[in-house]
Amino acid sequence: MAVTFSDLHTADGLKALEAHLAGKTYISGDGITKDDVKVFAAVPLKPSAEFPNAARWYDTVAAAVSSRFPGQASGVSASSAPAAAAPAASKDEDDDDDMDLFGDETEEDKKAAAEREAAKPAKKKESGKSSVLMDIKPWDDETDMKKLEEAVRSVQMEGLTWGASKLMPVGYGIKKLQIMLTIIDDLASTPIEEVLCEAPINEYVQSCDIVAFNKI
């Protein structure tokens, strides 16, 4: 049987609520329902100590609403003429409500969320980068190191960027080329050291070694 509360801004209205809550925690059922939320919205202030059952119920619903919506209030105020609480909805009517403060998402909510996700442009996956330091050694002390470096830098691969370089002494008048490079992992499919040891670059390059390798 539906229960109707009216004039909950008055003492007479609160007396009816107090009597209804005698021996009860909630308006209907063993847990908080939309009935509690609707009645709570019609009670402008926490009932005084004159209405202990109503005051206890008010605190219980207020705590549940606060936990459901934990965001900090920003000082908004609102006022309206007092109105009677709406009759408690039947179970069938509850099922038709658009919003359930204490229930799960409706099928419409889930469908709308899925459509929003599908409408978002797919984010391009960012490829990882690696910083590499290489030692490139010539055949002998007669190798033209300028041409060796030109041959090395002539290698162009997708995802490969050459960086700074310098000549380092090895011994017996031989110098090696130490050079930095950056590679985009998903694009540089062939190991650079293999390319540097192939013709025509191997006319100048005797061997190459990776000295340092770091993910960026």
UniProtKB/Swiss-Prot annotation:
GO biological process, one term: translational elongation
Compositional bias ranges of the Acidic residues kind: 92-107
GO cellular component: cytosol; eukaryotic translation elongation factor 1 complex
Function noted in UniProt: EF-1-beta and EF-1-beta' stimulate the exchange of GDP bound to EF-1-alpha to GTP.
Subunit structure: EF-1 is composed of 4 subunits: alpha, beta (1B-alpha=beta'), delta (1B-beta), and gamma (1B-gamma).
GO molecular function: guanyl-nucleotide exchange factor activity; translation elongation factor activity
Alphabetized Gene3D superfamilies for the sequence: 1.20.1050.10, 3.30.70.60
Classification lineage: Eukaryota, Viridiplantae, Streptophyta, Embryophyta, Tracheophyta
Region (Disordered): 71-131
Low complexity biased stretches: 73-89
UniProt KW keywords: Elongation factor, Protein biosynthesis
Family: Belongs to the EF-1-beta/EF-1-delta family.
Pfam families reported for this sequence: EF1_GNE (PF00736)
Feature: compositional bias, Basic and acidic residues: 108-128
Protein name: Elongation factor 1-beta
